[in-house]
Amino acid sequence: GVSFHVGSGAEDPKSFVKAVEDSRFVFDQAAEVGFDLKVLDVGGGFSEDTFERFAATLSDALDEYFPPHIRIIAEPGRI
């Protein structure tokens, strides 16, 4: 699978959208050479103040770029 960590203290939820888009690209590249990736591990960047907003943005991006059979692991980091 693929893992990304946006980083603690992220201030722009679009950084998660970009990370999901980049992950989709990696999944597609892997498929082109015969790998069937099944896991996406997302993490970092969430704080108590931004958790709700960032989680909603991340959820929307995951729905747009990944089918339901992909296993998503979320590691929010320090909250």
Swiss-Prot record:
Its cofactor is pyridoxal 5'-phosphate. Pyridoxal 5'-phosphate binds at residues 8, 45, 75-78. InterPro entries: De-COase2_CS, De-COase2_N, Orn_de-COase, PLP-binding_barrel. Pathway: Amine and polyamine biosynthesis; putrescine biosynthesis via L-ornithine pathway; putrescine from L-ornithine: step 1/1. It comes from the Eukaryota. Its EC number is 4.1.1.17. GO terms for cellular component: cytoplasm. The record marks 5 as: Stacks against the aromatic ring of pyridoxal phosphate and stabilizes reaction intermediates. GO terms for molecular function: ornithine decarboxylase activity. This is Ornithine decarboxylase. The gene is ODC.
